[in-house]
Amino acid sequence: MTNEVRVRYAPSPTGYPHLGNIRTAMFNWLFARHNGGKFIVRIEDTDRERYVEGAVESILESLNWLGLDWDEGPDKGGDYGPYYQSERLFLYRQAAERLVTEGKAYYCHCSSERLDKMREEQIARKEPPGYDRCCRDLCLGQKEGAVIRFKIPLEGQTTFIDLIRGEVTFDNAKQDDFVILKSDGFPTYHLASVVDDHAMQISHVLRAEEWLPSTPKHLMLYKALGYTPPQYAHLPMILGPDRSKLSKRHGATSTIEYKQAGYLPETMVNFLSLLGWAYDDKTELFSRKQLIEYFCLEKVSKTAAIFNYEKLDWMNGMYIRTLSAPDLASRAIPFLEKDERIAASGRLNFDYTTKVMPLIQERVKKLSELAELCWFIYSDNISYDPASLIDKKLTKDESLCALKAAFARLEALANFDAVSMEEHIRPLAAELELKPGQLFGMLRTASTGQQVAPPLFQTMEVLGRERCLGRIAMAIARLSELPS
């Protein structure tokens, strides 16, 4: 085995990648990049019954979205391909048959009916379910419906050093004679992962904690096949806020769902890195470069990580605020075009959106929130109750007088920019013996149709002279029609 660090992310396309799965990919990627090694993607598509169309594409889309580039794998190739297990079946059958020939595995002819009945009886006796080794010493040959099982050593222990958990020991007698080759000729995970990790010269296996009980099986296979095993590190579970296993009842679990909800890839990389790893007890925001520099297995926790949705939203808001206006605009447009009011306005373009984004950038936590905060800056189809133009401390006529005075002052401006507008409207409030907030509130409703909106004068500048004055004129007309 080479001294080079070679790690793999080996998802099964039996569903769309969830956050725990992608967290595993990211820790492998960070470990490879930190050590100057290789990150390999291998698609473990041997479970044909549970195979989901589109799952592979979703896996690769998730990796690409997060910027987790791979050195070998689908779309890249490499010296150790193919990188789909369904294209490597001959290797697994070869290994399984060698183990049978050497007396380390055997054909099992037990029917599914017998196995089901045996399992039911074991459960009824409150025994741990497992194969009773009926065919272990029968020297059976291959036949239709037969599987190949591995002969577990019936004595002794299997001990290994987990790079996160330290020394771990399992009693061999408590292990099952597990299936390594199914009746359809496809391998189980246990055999395929061992054969491929050896063939692809994987140096370290970083995987979810749920695979820890399988490790003795894999180490026995390595020994039986005469392979040198990689080093193992089992990553902590991710739990929901209620400390139960993270699931759909806590919220979205698919990585693509977070993309569609308007989370940034930078946020997700940062946030997922902190689910089980910490640089210190206070730093929470890391650039990709810093994560690569700081990441090490010594700082990965043994205990489960808690998924904090509030923290994710906070972090996403922080990252949104670091974006330049053009960058935010380009990311915002796919979300804004889903809003019919904005899409129909004819103003959804990059240049205009670049002007709009700074108005609301400080107020959002997700890109999906943008449209509701700015649709009225795009669309002229704004509606409101004209009575809302009347300040609560003024009469209708006093409010109308104030709006007319503001319109005249704005119409006379040489430069229709935020600074000029405020320089002329703020003193006008004093002249009218109003508080600035009273006059600003009437202008906000008149120009946007909203009681709460982005900064007033900056919004009016983006709307432009013609649209802004047109809206205020319309407000004056609507207010005039109300009874005094």
From Swiss-Prot:
Its EC number is 6.1.1.17. It comes from the Bacteria. Zn(2+) binds at residues 108, 110, 135, 137. GO terms for molecular function: ATP binding; glutamate-tRNA ligase activity; tRNA binding; zinc ion binding. Its cofactor is Zn(2+). Its main location: cytoplasm. Binds 1 zinc ion per subunit. Monomer. Catalyzes the attachment of glutamate to tRNA(Glu) in a two-step reaction: glutamate is first activated by ATP to form Glu-AMP and then transferred to the acceptor end of tRNA(Glu). HAMAP family: Glu_tRNA_synth_type1. This is Glutamate--tRNA ligase. It comes from Dehalococcoides mccartyi (strain ATCC BAA-2266 / KCTC 15142 / 195) (Dehalococcoides ethenogenes (strain 195)).
